[in-house]
Amino acid sequence: FFELDGKHVLLTSPQDMLPEGLEYHTGNGTLCIIGEMDKDTYTLKEQFNQSVDYGIDFYAMQTVEAPDGRRIMIGWMQNWDTLAHRCNDSKWFAQMSLPRELSVKNGRLYQTPIKELDALRKNRVEYNDVVIENDTITLDRVEGRTIDMELVIRPEDKENVYKKFALRFAQNEKFHTELSFRPYESVLKIDRKFSGTERALVHQRRCLVNGDANELKLRVILDRFSAEVFINHG
């Protein structure tokens, strides 16, 4: 619980949740309540609520206030339902998320990678005005298992919007993970069913995207064992 940008914010990680549209999913989840604190009764008057993270594995987030006043959050990229699937010969299991800077805008909790990560960027590759026409393309030098990538996707003709955009990563001849967006539905989906797991785990998760459906902005940070996606600046 903390104060941020003129609002009071409560973060919690409920268990055994019931689904509610695309905002909340079954099982272990995350919840952010934004409102005003009544200092006389010590109660939080709720104004908005949302999931903290819309991915498949994110739980038990914690925050700290940095010396410069930033509110920084980190989360556990795992959940209680999959703890039994640890391989006996593995030296470690699960991991923590990247640190994220939090802010509150228009009743929503925004999250962006901390600015310190920018110092780790190198070997810059940039493409502009790439046109995709009913086909799959690969871009030279956009490769590897550790990437910090920013994309802006928009239709050439706003009156004739594309049906689906998909980005595949961690891909070889047999495996891949896919991130896709359908502008007519404003829905972004992560699909890891072809990532190589042999377990009957949750493989897909969808979320609604706020903002202009004619322009989608993504920042995808790909690690060897994870992918974190930030939509429309957080």
Report each predicted region and the residues it spans:
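Beta-rich accessory regions
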Residues: 3, 31, 36-57, 62-234
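Structural motif
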Residues: 18-34
